[in-house]
């Protein structure tokens, strides 16, 4: 399993979107919003984020993010930057439509990892969407430069605020 180095710094915006199984073909609805958070992930890459998730996005400030508590899973997604996810029961809007199940976050402006070959890209995609959250590890012992696996990891947001 290949590894990626990254650093944690500064402020950023996160996008809350439904966690549909087909992330690669999903297109953002017009009313999708960004929520401010005290987290930006910068990790080694040779190209910028591209695809249907690129801007321009209107940014909104909200305390919504902090209500989820200090512990969240995240993974590096080659196509969409950094992904946060919180396992939760389904949430509904006022007319009963499912909003998020589970909730997933995408960090705006994140650069994605570039693999050297199509086989590595496939391995990378498979590792993201077939991960076992029980294999998560805490990487906050050194926030200046940490190594992470392609599988989801655990991060304590309290240490960043």
From Swiss-Prot:
It comes from the Eukaryota. One of its GO terms (cellular component) is nucleus. This is Uncharacterized protein C83.12. It comes from Schizosaccharomyces pombe (strain 972 / ATCC 24843).
